[in-house]
Structure formats: structure tokens, C-alpha cells
Amino acid sequence: IMATCIDMAGATYPAKYKGNDIIPMAGKSLLPIFKTGHREGHDYLGFEHFNERAFLAKDGWKLVRPGENAKWELYNLNEDRSEQHNLADKYPEKKNEMVKAYEEWAKRCMVEPYPGQKKK
């Protein structure tokens, strides 16, 4: 949402503030959708909320970890929109690829580690 607000305001996201480097913005503006009905999307979309994690790929795969001690689950949303069939054991390479991409995203966006949590 921040990228959209900055775009609508005609502003630019700063690289520094008071001499301090600012973490680059990771999002993309939704303004092109409002203007043209189309926008180039991300290859992946990740989120975390109270230790529940999810990572969606442009090709329809979704990686889910429903809690800190839970195992990663993998779903093919093209064939299973209601996420009834966990395919993590059937497609371990795809799961591992997406876990690696999630971890890279989480580190880049400073999603993890949480304050007070030890780094892995």
C-alpha cells in the first residue's frame, strides 16, 4: 500500500533520512491497475502474521506455515483453491524451492527474526 500512496502523491521513496540509509521499499504501486486495469505483478507474494507465514508464487503454488512449530504445507491453487490437499510430501523440491525463496524474502524485508528472537 505504501508504494501506491507514494505513487499517488507523486513523491519518491528516499534512500536516506538524516544521513541514515533507509531499507528499500519492496512493494509495487497499484496505481496502474486503477488507471489501466493492468499492472505487472510480482513473481512471489509473501506475508507473515503472528508466526503464520504464507508465500504465493505467480504460477499458482502456495506455501503455508500455520504456526511457529508447524511444518510447511504446499498447495497448488490452480487445482485446489480451498487448500484441502497438502502436496509438501509429494513435491519436496518445489516446497524446498519456495521455502528458500520465502526465507530470502523474509530476510530482505526484515520480516524475521522478530525482536528478541535469535537468528537461525
Model segments located where?
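C-terminal cap/loop subdomain of S1 sulfatases and analogous C-terminal strand-loop tails that border
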Residues: M2-L77, R108-E112
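Short, conserved loop/turn and helix-capping segments at secondary-structure boundaries
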Residues: P24, A88-P92
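Short amphipathic beta-strand/extended segments with alternating polar/hydrophobic composition
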Residues: L63-R65, N86-D89
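Intrinsically disordered, low-complexity polar regions and short flexible loop motifs
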Residues: D80
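Short amphipathic alpha-helical coiled-coil/interface segments
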Residues: Y91, K95-Y102, A106
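Short amphipathic alpha-helical segments at helix boundaries and their inter-helical linkers
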Residues: V99-K100, M110-Y114
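Short, charged, surface-exposed hinge/linker loops at domain edges
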Residues: Y114-K120
